[in-house]
């Protein structure tokens, strides 16, 4: 119909499918290359056809350009959250424990097993620590493996809560953790930041940028990042936050200021409106 196409990628779709196909045991090895090539063909077609292509962070835009998208089509529009809903959550009252939260689905891509092993190592050095894993089950078999691992390691201080009201539950937490193998721009980190909770993450997607800030950012570090599947690094990073309440408070303030400036829902909506107005203007202000 010769209509303009607007493409939004929260992750790099083709790269994510490539990772899944490479890992998939049920795909015949000789067919994997063909299937991956098919997704790259689709990616090239939509990049060529699109009027605008948006993504969540700068490195994702660089990848889109490397994959053949014209730089002039690309825009970065960050995720936005309801800042006011979370910013008033009080810091946890001192009770002799350090409580770590993980707002995460029980799925292999979230690498809950590495989180559990890292907490096991942390528990050898910090005794008064608890881990709250908050989220539903995406993969029942994987979830059962995680439950069994906790039993095998005799980790009584890991709590699987299921889905919770994150606004209410955040009051119980000192900081949060995310151990994903792949991410875009995780909302769970932004929500933690809005509530003045620093975060430990893996160095995937936009996590490093969220923790350290963009070039123009003046707020300072909001937590620590380590390589994916690096349990020792995760344990060390968690320990740094466990042993220093002033460090948690300072990084939490940095985190909240960063979200307030760059990642509010209102900012995101206005940036998308600008893209729609560009298309309207191109088409003589006719309907898209």
PLM-predicted stretches and their roles:
Residues 59, 80:
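Carbohydrate-associated surface elements
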Residues 81, 103, 130-144, 160:
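Glycosyltransferase donor-sugar binding loop
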């Amino acid at each position: 119909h010769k209509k303009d196409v607007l493409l939004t990628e929260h992750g790099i779709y083709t790269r994510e499918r490539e990772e899944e196909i490479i890992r998939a045991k049920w795909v015949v090895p000789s067919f994997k290359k063909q299937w991956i090539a098919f997704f790259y063909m689709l990616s090239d077609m939509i990049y060529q056809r699109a009027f605008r292509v948006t993504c969540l962070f700068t490195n994702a835009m660089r990848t889109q350009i490397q994959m053949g998208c014209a730089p002039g089509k690309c825009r970065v529009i960050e995720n936005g959250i309801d800042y006011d809903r979370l910013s008033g959550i009080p810091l946890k009252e001192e009770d002799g424990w350090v409580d770590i939260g993980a707002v995460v689905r029980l799925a292999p891509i979230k690498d809950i097993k590495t989180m559990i092993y890292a907490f096991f190592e942390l528990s050898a050095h910090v005794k008064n620590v608890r881990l709250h894993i908050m989220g539903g089950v995406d993969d029942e078999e994987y979830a059962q493996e995680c439950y069994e691992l906790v039993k095998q390691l005799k980790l009584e201080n890991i709590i699987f809560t299921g889905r919770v009201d994150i606004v209410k539950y955040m009051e119980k937490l000192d900081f949060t953790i995310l151990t994903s193998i792949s991410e875009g721009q995780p909302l769970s980190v932004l929500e933690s930041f809005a509530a003045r909770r620093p975060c430990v993450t893996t160095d995937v997607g936009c996590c490093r940028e969220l923790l350290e800030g963009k070039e123009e950012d003046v707020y300072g570090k909001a937590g620590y990042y380590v390589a994916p599947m690096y349990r020792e690094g995760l344990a060390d990073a968690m320990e740094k936050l466990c042993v220093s309440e002033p460090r948690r408070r300072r990084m939490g303030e940095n985190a909240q200021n960063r979200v307030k400036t760059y990642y509010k829902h209102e900012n995101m909506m206005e940036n998308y409106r600008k893209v729609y107005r560009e298309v309207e203007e191109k088409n003589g202000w006719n309907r898209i």
